[in-house]
């Protein structure tokens, strides 16, 4: 079996397992069996309905980790798909199926890359590990974060981590994520006095009180970003008030909002500024906060250089380092690993009907991962 067909065969096996969060459907068991044959020690770290796999080969440093998730989002209406989302289907140069791009192809490519690398260089420097979870697309409370806590408790610290998220845009290799913005959400409840719209002097309209404060929040420059991050953004995601009647002044207004923030801001700093702004407008309010994740950044260095060089050698593409997009499990790994980068296939169809990956990209993806291991773990 050729290397590219080995990747294709494995990703087909993974897609055929309908591993919607948090159900792993033995994806990790399949992978562990292969990794054990390549000399990896495999350990399942389960929590609730979530399955996590930690597989490591070697004991020395540096420790290079590949991180990924075996779970996928629900397929949505199956009648909208041109083929069964859990029957891997090759058509017009693409492989279709839920998880094809996000991120079962990355997992298959790295496993085969690790098999090739360890077979060719059994005495390589350092160690290689895989961290896989079935809880990335869901709450993400019993997945990667639990494994990171366990690794921290026993002093097992990765030096480099590649997260196999689908980061590429137009072509394989054009984008790597060397950081991600943080996510801070708020639920703001502004108190008013319900009443009849014909007697506004007997009521207090929380929407009228909220509007100027909300406008100021939307117009505020929270920071200017920095070399790696765009400026922090503020967005309202939901606004609710009233009973549905046209003649009743609402008794309260509820706003859900979110900051995507850079390393130029901190959660506490953003919270303090929001409270000061609301207090300035004289609002009676309650505000609950939820920190979805802090920003992380890997400056240019050994890991970024190794991956960018591997991409150029395999594809000729000059990869761009970017911090745009949503959060990922990289936010948990960055707390125990000094260098984290995300790289994987094109992301145009992730979470969509007819999710797909170009068949011709599977072997280059595997080769990029293998070349990165060579750049990090072989004498230069």
UniProtKB/Swiss-Prot annotation:
Which residues make up the binding site for Zn(2+) 2? 102, 137, 351
Give the top-rank taxon of the lineage listed in the UniProt record for this protein.
Bacteria
Keywords assigned by UniProt? Amino-acid biosynthesis, Cobalt, Diaminopimelate biosynthesis, Hydrolase, Lysine biosynthesis, Metal-binding, Zinc
Per the UniProt entry, what are the Gene Ontology biological process annotations, in alphabetical order?
diaminopimelate biosynthetic process; L-arginine biosynthetic process; lysine biosynthetic process via diaminopimelate
Provide the active-site residues from the annotation.
71, 136
| Pathway terms, separated by semicolons | Amino-acid biosynthesis; L-lysine biosynthesis via DAP pathway; LL-2,6-diaminopimelate from (S)-tetrahydrodipicolinate (succinylase route): step 3/3
Question: In the Enzyme Commission scheme, what number(s) does this protein have?
Answer: 3.5.1.18
Among the GO molecular function terms of this UniProt record, one is: acetylornithine deacetylase activity
PROSITE patterns xref list: ARGE_DAPE_CPG2_2 (PS00759)
**Cell cycle found in the keyword field:** no
EC main group: hydrolase
Protein name, entry field: Succinyl-diaminopimelate desuccinylase
Organism lineage: Bacteria, Pseudomonadati, Pseudomonadota, Betaproteobacteria, Burkholderiales
What's the gene?
A: dapE
């Amino acid at each position: 079996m050729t290397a590219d067909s080995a990747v294709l065969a494995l990703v087909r096996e993974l897609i055929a397992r309908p591993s919607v969060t948090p159900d792993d459907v033995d994806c990790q068991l399949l992978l562990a069996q292969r990794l054990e044959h390549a000399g990896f020690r495999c350990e399942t770290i389960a929590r609730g309905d979530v399955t996590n796999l930690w597989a490591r080969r070697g004991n020395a440093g540096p420790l290079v980790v590949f991180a990924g998730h075996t779970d996928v989002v629900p397929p949505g209406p199956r009648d909208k798909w041109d083929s069964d989302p859990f029957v891997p289907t090759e058509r017009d140069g693409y492989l279709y199926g839920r998880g094809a791009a996000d991120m079962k192809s990355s997992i298959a490519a790295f496993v085969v890359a690790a098999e090739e690398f360890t077979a060719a260089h059994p005495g390589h420097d350092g160690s290689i590990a895989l961290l896989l979870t079935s809880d990335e697309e869901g709450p993400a409370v019993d997945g990667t974060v639990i494994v990171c806590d366990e690794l921290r408790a026993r002093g097992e610290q990765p030096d480099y981590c590649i997260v196999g998220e689908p980061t590429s845009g137009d072509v394989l290799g054009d984008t790597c994520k060397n950081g991600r913005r943080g996510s801070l959400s708020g639920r703001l409840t502004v108190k008013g006095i319900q009443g009849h719209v014909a007697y506004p002097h007997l009521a207090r309209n929380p929407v009228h009180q909220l509007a100027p404060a909300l406008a100021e929040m939307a117009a505020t420059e929270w920071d200017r970003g920095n070399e790696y991050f765009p400026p922090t953004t503020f967005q309202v995601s939901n606004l609710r008030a009233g009973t549905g009647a046209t003649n009743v002044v609402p008794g309260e207004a509820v706003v859900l909002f979110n900051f995507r923030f850079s390393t130029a801001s901190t959660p506490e700093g953003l919270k303090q500024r929001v409270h000061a702004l609301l207090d300035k407008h004289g609002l009676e309010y309650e505000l609950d906060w939820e920190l979805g994740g802090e920003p992380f950044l890997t400056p240019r260095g050994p890991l970024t250089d190794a991956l960018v060089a591997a991409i150029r050698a395999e594809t000729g593409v000059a990869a761009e380092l970017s911090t745009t997009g949503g959060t990922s499990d990289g936010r948990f790994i960055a707390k125990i690993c000094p260098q984290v980068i995300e790289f994987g296939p094109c992301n145009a169809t992730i979470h969509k009907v007819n999710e797909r990956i170009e068949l011709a990209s599977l072997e280059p993806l595997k080769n990029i991962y293998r070349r990165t291991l060579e750049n990090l773990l072989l004498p230069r």
